[in-house]
A protein has these predicted regions:
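Short linear motifs at protein or domain termini
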Residues: 1-119
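C-terminal all-alpha effector/ligand-binding and dimerization domain
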Residues: 2-14, 25, 129-133, 179-190
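Flexible, glycine- and charge-enriched loops at secondary-structure boundaries
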Residues: 30, 140, 188
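Amphipathic, non-membrane alpha-helical segments in soluble helical-bundle scaffolds
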Residues: 69, 96-103, 124, 160, ...
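Conserved amphipathic alpha-helical segments that form helical-bundle/coiled-coil interaction surfaces
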Residues: 119-184
């Protein structure tokens, strides 16, 4: 069911279960498509610079082009996808300066959010569970996703939804840098 350029490491059955909501409440199609594409980008399954063809993604994910188009727009707004007139969408290619700027911003903001979460008495059990998932991960993609969850849990209790949203975007963009760095094609450019 999944074609080669968009194949998921977790396979067609997992993608189908995710899209149909078999594992829980039925998410909107756009949210499901958004999460599936984001996961593939951050896991390095979709490489930096790789074209994201709406029709192909729609076929692979078993949806119409509309939720794919909306998901790509949202991912472009989050800095994971670049949109070009007449060329369409592609996985964003990050240069070294952008990578440094992303990590710099995250290093400035995340410690403050963590300090606020500590002051608020945040429940650290989900962070601990994410660390355990990272330790037990079967592959690098699974470990990376658990690590992202761990970092999110560190700042999730800061009490400021805007700060959480900003850090979520920075976290995703730095994960893109990590995925790009691990690609043999060299998705981080000088």
């Amino acid at each position: 069911m999944m074609s080669a350029p968009y194949a998921s490491a977790s396979g067609p059955a997992a993608a189908t279960a995710f899209l149909t909501g078999a594992a829980g409440a039925l998410p909107s199609r756009t949210v499901a498509v958004l999460e599936a594409i984001k996961r593939a980008i951050l896991a390095g399954e979709l490489k930096p610079g790789q074209a994201l063809v709406e029709a192909d993604l729609a076929e692979v994910l078993g949806v119409s082009k509309t939720p794919v188009r909306e998901a790509l727009k949202t991912l472009a707004g989050a800095g994971l996808v670049s949109m070009s007139p007449y060329k369409g969408a592609a996985v964003r290619v990050v240069d070294h300066e952008q990578a440094r700027n992303l990590y710099d911003a995250r290093l400035l903001i995340e410690p403050e959010a963590l300090a606020r979460a500590v002051a608020a008495g945040h429940d650290w059990r989900p962070a601990h569970q994410a660390l355990q998932r990272a330790d037990q991960a079967a592959d690098q993609a699974e470990r990376s996703l658990a690590n992202r969850d761990f970092h999110r849990e560190l700042y999730a209790g800061c009490g400021n939804p805007l700060l959480i949203h900003m850090l979520d975007d920075l976290r995703d963009q730095t994960a893109l840098v990590s995925a790009a760095a691990s690609c043999s094609q060299g998705g981080v450019r000088a």
